[in-house]
């Protein structure tokens, strides 16, 4: 598999414009990225632009704080699928995890998994920068129990992004059959190679073109 096919080509800034989404989807077609990862408002346009392409549309759920209710997250998933999303990246209820309310964390994830079942792949963002190692392990274990397809490090909107150490811990926790996505601060081919070596099977990056072409990113982002 090429590096491009492991990358979710990402544009999640709040001020993203239509012109930028059109450029993102054009690049996805050209380079063969796994997906474009966009905010829900851009799902329909992105799906139209990628009709017939190998790249699919990924969107974010309960993003970036994860503090919506399970019911709201489930609705977001259904709406996104209706608009053409094939993958959804949800943020866990981080406060509930900190409170050791594992039942709520699981119910929250399961609401998304159930809403997406058979229609969209689910990635669970645990926001590693806010967690202890014990909490990272617990979050991954709960996500697997709830039926996720992937666990993912970061939103790119908090205090830190992906590290090889966190990827290795997540991979060790979920085993070989669940995907692990590194996201947040992955900007170069070298960054990607480190993450893959640590166990990542998907990369979230706004610098996708620079990564596959070897060029320097025009403007570094946190995701």
UniProtKB/Swiss-Prot annotation:
Q: Which SMART domains match?
A: DeoC
Reaction catalyzed: 2-deoxy-D-ribose 5-phosphate = D-glyceraldehyde 3-phosphate + acetaldehyde
Name a GO molecular-function annotation: deoxyribose-phosphate aldolase activity
Where in the cell? Cytoplasm
Can you supply one Gene Ontology CC term for this chain's record? cytoplasm
List the pathway annotation: Carbohydrate degradation; 2-deoxy-D-ribose 1-phosphate degradation; D-glyceraldehyde 3-phosphate and acetaldehyde from 2-deoxy-alpha-D-ribose 1-phosphate: step 2/2
Q: Which domain of life is it from?
A: Bacteria
EC number(s) per UniProt? 4.1.2.4
Read off the InterPro entries from this record. Aldolase_TIM, DeoC, DeoC/FbaB/LacD_aldolase, DeoC_typeI
Q: Does the keyword Amino-acid biosynthesis apply?
A: no
The UniProt entry lists the main location of this chain as cytoplasm
Any Pfam family: DeoC
Q: Which residues cross the membrane?
A: none
According to its UniProt record, which residues of this chain constitute the active site?
89 (proton donor/acceptor), 152 (schiff-base intermediate with acetaldehyde), 181 (proton donor/acceptor)
Q: Which GO terms describe its biological process?
A: 2-deoxyribose 1-phosphate catabolic process; carbohydrate catabolic process; deoxyribonucleotide catabolic process
Entry keyword set: Cytoplasm, Lyase, Schiff base
Please explain the role this protein plays, according to its UniProt record. Catalyzes a reversible aldol reaction between acetaldehyde and D-glyceraldehyde 3-phosphate to generate 2-deoxy-D-ribose 5-phosphate.
The family classification in the record reads: Belongs to the DeoC/FbaB aldolase family. DeoC type 1 subfamily.
Question: Entry's HAMAP family?
Answer: DeoC_type1
Q: What is this protein called?
A: Deoxyribose-phosphate aldolase
Gene name for this UniProt entry: deoC
């Amino acid at each position: 598999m090429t590096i491009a096919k492991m990358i979710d080509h990402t544009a999640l800034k709040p001020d993203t414009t239509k012109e930028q989404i059109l450029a993102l989807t054009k690049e996805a077609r050209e380079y063969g990225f796994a997906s474009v990862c966009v905010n829900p408002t851009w799902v329909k346009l992105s799906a139209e632009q990628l009709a017939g392409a190998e790249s699919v549309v990924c969107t974010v759920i309960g993003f970036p704080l994860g503090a919506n209710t399970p019911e709201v997250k489930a609705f977001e998933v259904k709406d996104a699928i209706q608009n053409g999303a094939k993958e959804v990246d949800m943020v866990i209820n981080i406060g509930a995890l900190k409170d050791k309310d594992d039942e709520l964390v699981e119910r929250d994830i399961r609401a998304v998994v159930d809403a997406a079942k058979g229609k969209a792949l689910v990635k669970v963002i645990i926001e590693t920068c806010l967690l202890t190692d014990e909490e990272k392990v617990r979050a991954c274990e709960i996500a697997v129990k709830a039926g996720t397809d992937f666990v993912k490090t970061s939103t790119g909107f908090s205090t830190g992004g992906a590290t090889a150490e966190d990827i290795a811990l997540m991979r060790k926790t979920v085993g070989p059959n669940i995907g692990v996505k590194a996201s947040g601060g992955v900007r170069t081919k070298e960054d990607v190679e480190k993450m893959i070596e640590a166990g990542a099977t998907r990369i979230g990056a706004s610098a996708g073109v620079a990564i596959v072409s070897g060029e320097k990113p025009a403007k570094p982002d946190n995701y």
